Regions:
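Feature marking well-ordered beta-strand scaffolds used for ligand recognition
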Residues: 1-361
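A structural detector for beta-sheet-dominated domains
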Residues: 25, 49, 71, 101, ...
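Calcium-binding loop positions in Ca2+-binding modules
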Residues: 30, 81, 131-132, 177, ...
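Acidic glycine/aspartate-rich repeat arrays in secreted/surface proteins
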Residues: 274, 407-493
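A recurrent domain-boundary module in secreted/ectodomain proteins
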Residues: 341-361, 367, 479-501, 661-679
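Glycine- and aspartate-rich repeat motifs characteristic of hemolysin/RTX-like Ca2+-binding segments
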Residues: 352-414, 418, 456, 473-479, ...
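Cellulosome-associated attachment modules in secreted, modular CAZymes
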Residues: 494-679
């Protein structure tokens, strides 16, 4: 997909070598690329051309007053009626930059009145809150991040500062809330600040959970609004990583993916990354010390899918990538890359003339004759790609995939039902298993060749492949020499460990799919729609969960799986005594045993209350290992338990529900096996 086109240069070493930053600006429907070099250099303007080479448009050597003080930054800002290419100027007292004329050429050197942090700038971002325009600037020397009102005459008024540094900065609005996101390579900090609606000052939002991703030396930061969400992508140089997080309305960052560079990709020691959205599809381009660039796309749930990489050649000039810019021009992505070693700008292209639709659904989902991205929903789904180079993504339930003609990518989902691919073309199609946790090479899979294809098994996952030609398939035919693309690290280790153990609630509980459920903290929620495979999600520590069910009425059965926390101490030796009393024909010490007591007493779940149950409960109480770990069970509160006796402990867990537009509530009874209490 990545096509090398050419290297463009002016012929002046001061303008072509040591390019530190690039920026794009469109005037009157024409897009211009601005490149800046460091001290002793200047600015070059290239006019982008649909289907052709960029044309030299203008240049400007840095004037003598700033020539030896300029850093690598070249960022676009609008000050009043003027557009400015702002620079990092070491000893300046105001913000310095060159005015940009509406024909794309470079105008006069400008400097604002003095601002508290001066003009030694490492990152900046401009945004609006209501009718007020703001500029937030990271000032290197002063060690703080300042926020300024941009007045109508182009002057800056300081409204506040927060301590810290940033090498990358972006702004994003989620609903009515405006946020500034920063990244700093020195302390590995990813910070989110909300903007006060009245004063414009920045207030930091606690996002310490992002530290679990292991992002080291973040060098690039991008935001994008896509698929109905706001996303933050961070590239880490020392961690050789690209991370995707969803920015929620309250300013919290929720990790969705964490991809690591491999021998097959080219974003090791990543220095820059750009994200662009085209017709509902998100593309990511990244590169750095790995002498090349990698192209990825992002799914509607924030996962990165590998598309292609381009490695440096003797002609291309991208050894040690420094900066990247991506523009959508005509039917192409035009990618411009500057190197720390080579002069000029390298132009790569990606053709988008066959870009199709992004479609997510249940039942039968049909693509077009172009390059579609089809995602299965939460119900059993049949994805039919048709012609084109399609991406087909498995859902949470059973998924059947038919790629059709073209080079298709079949993306598996961990924790789904059986996935069947009906027309896999070895050597043309690709099977992407990046969602399978800790999977690094095909040798970890169990691949069984069948008469018409192959069966692939990993942990509890199964993929049935039927070859397009009807013949058998081997692991080598499916995967070649190994997996393509980056490795992915789980952002939620609950997928490996299952539901966490935490305290619960005994007795009547109401399960609300739209709110907190204290009795369901850290539990696994399993919903089986009528006629479909089960759907499973894990609740958070407040018992909140989202099954992501489709609109309309959906009847089914809900069950809950919750482990016992030994730290709670709810099961004691007295519980073992109560069970032993029941087993020998006596009642508990408080009187006759209720049906709920008998269910709790039968911890072995063999249908009777006996001495083995008492022994298992005693082992739990004193901390000894047992073959029968306690767990919570949840029953329909209206269930008839009158037939339960000590020799007939027969019951059904869960409850029938009818979800309406994805929501339901149901009254249940929560019972901890092994815990015998008066009801």
């Amino acid at each position: 997909m990545l096509q090398f086109e050419r290297v463009v240069a002016t012929g002046s070493p001061a303008l072509d070598s040591g390019i530190g930053d690039t920026a794009l600006k469109t005037f009157n429907g024409v897009t211009y690329l601005y490149s800046t070099t460091r001290a002793g250099g200047g600015i070059v303007v290239w006019q982008l051309v649909d289907g052709g080479a960029p044309q030299f448009h203008d240049d400007q050597y840095f004037s003598g007053t700033i020539s030896l003080q300029v850093g690598s930054l070249g960022a676009l800002v609008a000050l009043g009626a003027s557009d400015l290419l702002a620079l990092d100027v070491d000893t300046a007292t105001g913000l310095v930059g060159y005015e940009l004329n509406t024909d794309g050429t470079i105008g006069a050197l400008q400097e604002t009145a003095a601002i508290p942090g001066g003009g030694d700038v490492t990152a900046l971002v401009q945004y609006s809150v209501g009718a007020v325009d703001y500029l937030t600037v990271a000032h290197q020397d002063s060690g703080f991040i300042g926020t300024y009102v941009v007045n109508s005459n182009g002057s800056l008024s300081h409204v506040g500062s927060v301590a810290g540094n940033a090498g990358a900065m972006q702004a994003a609005a989620v609903g009515s809330n405006q946020y500034v996101v920063t990244a700093n390579a020195t302390d590995n900090a990813i910070r989110v600040f909300s903007t006060d609606q009245g004063s414009g000052t920045l207030i930091e939002v606690d996002n310490t959970t992002t530290q679990t991703l292991g992002i080291s030396s973040p060098t690039a930061l991008e935001t994008v609004d896509a698929y109905g969400h706001t996303w933050v992508l961070v590239a880490g140089s020392s961690s050789n990583s690209i991370s995707v997080m969803e920015l929620r309305a309250d300013g919290t960052l929720v990790p969705q993916d964490h991809a690591l560079d491999t021998l097959g990709t080219r974003f090791g020691a990543v220095q820059d990354m750009k994200v662009v959205e085209v017709d509902g599809r998100v593309f990511v381009v990244a590169g750095g010390g790995d002498d090349g660039v990698t192209l990825l796309t992002m799914t509607p749930d924030g996962k990165l899918i590998y598309l292609d990489s381009f490695a440096d050649t003797v002609d291309s000039g991208i050894q040690n990538v420094e900066t990247i810019e991506v523009a959508h021009v005509g039917d192409d992505l035009q990618i411009f890359v500057a190197s720390q070693q080579d002069a000029g700008l390298t132009q790569l292209t990606v053709s988008l003339d066959s870009l199709g639709n992004v479609i997510e659904g249940n039942g039968i989902v049909t693509g077009t004759a172009q390059d579609d991205m089809l995602s299965a929903g939460v119900l059993d789904t049949d994805l039919q790609g048709g012609a084109g180079d399609d991406i087909l993504i498995a859902g949470r339930s059973e998924t059947t995939m038919q790629g059709g003609s073209g080079a298709d990518i079949f993306v598996m989902r961990f924790g789904s039902g059986l996935t069947t691919i009906t027309d896999f073309e070895a050597g043309t199609d690709r099977l992407d298993l990046f969602d399978y946790p800790m999977l690094r090479n095909p040798g970890q899979l169990t691949v069984t060749s069948t008469a018409q294809g192959a069966r692939i098994e990993f942990m509890d996952e199964t993929v049935e492949l039927f070859s397009a030609d009807g013949g058998t398939l081997t692991s080598a035919e499916i995967f070649g020499s190994g997996f393509k693309g980056p490795d992915h690290i789980p952002v939620d280790f609950g997928v490996l460990t299952g539901p966490e153990a935490s305290a619960g609630v005994t007795g009547p509980v109401t399960v609300e799919s739209s709110g907190s459920n204290p009795a369901l903290s850290d539990a696994e929620i399993v919903f089986k729609p009528v006629g479909n495979s089960p759907i499973s999600v894990q609740a958070d520590d407040q018992g909140q969960f989202d099954l992501d069910l489709p609109s309309g009425s959906l009847p089914g059965h809900v069950d809950i799986i919750k482990s016992y926390s030994h730290a709670s101490g709810e099961i004691t030796a007295l519980d073992a005594l109560q069970v032993l009393r029941i087993a020998v024909g006596l009642g508990p010490t408080w009187g006759p045993a209720a049906p709920e007591n008998l269910i709790a007493a039968d911890i072995t779940q063999d249908g009777t209350v006996n001495a083995l149950d008492a022994l298992a409960i005693l082992q739990i109480a004193v901390g000894l290992p047992t073959a029968h770990e306690p767990e919570w069970v949840y029953l329909d509160q209206t269930a008839d338990l009158s037939s339960i006796t000590p020799t007939n402990v027969d019951y059904q867990t869960g409850a029938a529900v009818a979800a309406l537009d994805g929501m339901f509530n149901v009254d249940m009874t929560s019972i901890l096996l092994g815990n015998i209490e008066a009801v």
